[in-house]
From Swiss-Prot:
Disulfide topology: 41-117, 74-79, 123-317, 202-228
Entry keyword set: Calcium, Disulfide bond, Glycoprotein, Heme, Hydrogen peroxide, Iron, Metal-binding, Oxidoreductase, Peroxidase, Pyrrolidone carboxylic acid, Secreted, Signal
Signal sequence range: 1-30
EC number(s) on file: 1.11.1.7
Family under the similarity heading: Belongs to the peroxidase family. Classical plant (class III) peroxidase subfamily.
Protein name: Basic peroxidase
Length: 321
């Protein structure tokens, strides 16, 4: 068999494959709709909203947990609820997802929906809607969620290890990591603003204290050092936003400007580099941050969706059936 081809033909192969990939992505997203459950489960959205409001009301930290669940799901294998699957070899069991919590919040929302519309609404859609409702519940922005995602039947722990961003990444690594998912630098900075909510463990921010040349405010450094020594206390929690950790606002960015970002991947966003201007804009214009965050969440929540006759609608989000 001969493999001699003209240079023009060789160039056409990757272009052809790129067009196929783009068309497939557009086709999948085209099957999403805001009216997807209007006839099959008209109370789906209100049922999810009530469940999430109740969960966040009982513990405001749940808002951060739910938003993080969506992020970790979408970055590995797409927004297909693969993260929610339990068992050996699953994304959920990956060390990269160690410390990810809140699965019971989605399970409760799923159970509530199953009571009114059994076997209709996917876990992937419930997670996407729940993240939006969690944001609203703590004073954050709302956004339109297009529906019609299906649930995957597989989950990949190894892919979680390679695809998820890490708390010790430098700026160039973060930009590349998000670009791999079709998200630009501004969207990366906006989505990082979800760290206005939630907490991180000592094992995740220890490098910020002892192994980083990034600027760190002295009193903040002293406080972190006391809570998180060079060894031990791995599970000690500290808020990602030390000012208003349970409310959605722009204080996360204000903290970065004063060198009080908890993770290395936080502080690199404001470190005399290309993203400083975006951080400054979000400090000065909280409405711009809220709008950009909402738009980025919409885009992220449609990464790699499973639609149509592909995938399934799980009865229990943790089981592949």
């Amino acid at each position: 068999m001969s493999y001699h081809k003209s240079s023009g033909t060789i160039l056409m192969v990757p272009l052809f494959m790129l067009l196929i990939s783009v068309n497939y992505f557009m086709s999948c997203n085209a099957q999403l709709s805001t009216t997807f459950y209007d006839t099959t489960c008209p109370t789906a959205l209100s049922t999810i909203r009530t469940s999430i409001r109740s969960s966040v009301s009982s513990n405001r930290r749940n808002a951060a947990l739910v938003i993080r669940l969506l992020f970790h799901d979408c970055f590995v294998q797409g927004c297909d609820a693969s993260l929610l699957l339990s068992g050996a070899g699953s994304e959920r069991a990956s060390p990269a997802n160690d410390g990810v919590l809140g699965y019971e919040v989605i399970d409760a929302a799923k159970a509530a929906v199953e009571r009114v519309c059994p076997g209709v609404v996917s876990c992937a859609d419930i997670l996407a809607v729940a993240a939006r409702d969690a944001s609203v519940a703590v004073g954050g922005p709302s956004w339109t969620v297009r529906l019609g995602r299906r649930d995957s039947t597989t989950s990949n722990a190894a892919q979680a290890a390679t695809d998820l961003p890490r708390g010790n990444m430098v700026l160039s690594q973060l930009i590349s990591n998000f670009a791999n998912k079709g998200l630009n630098t501004r969207e990366m900075v906006a989505l990082s603003g979800s760290h206005t909510l939630g907490q991180a463990r000592c094992i995740r921010f220890r490098g910020r204290i002892y192994n980083s040349t990034l600027r760190i405010e002295p009193n903040f450094n002293r406080s972190l050092s006391q809570a998180c020594p060079p060894t031990g206390n791995d599970a000690t929690l500290r808020p990602l936003d030390l000012v208003t950790p349970n409310s959605f606002d722009n204080n996360y960015y204000r903290n970065l400007v004063t060198s009080r970002g908890l993770l290395i991947s936080d502080q690199v966003l404001f470190n005399a580099d290309s993203t400083d201007s975006i951080v400054t804009e979000y400090v000065n214009n909280p409405a711009t941050f809220a709008a950009d965050f909402a738009a980025a969440m919409v885009k992220m929540s449609e990464i790699g969706v499973v639609t149509g006759t592909s995938g399934i609608v799980r009865t229990l989000c943790g089981n592949p059936s």
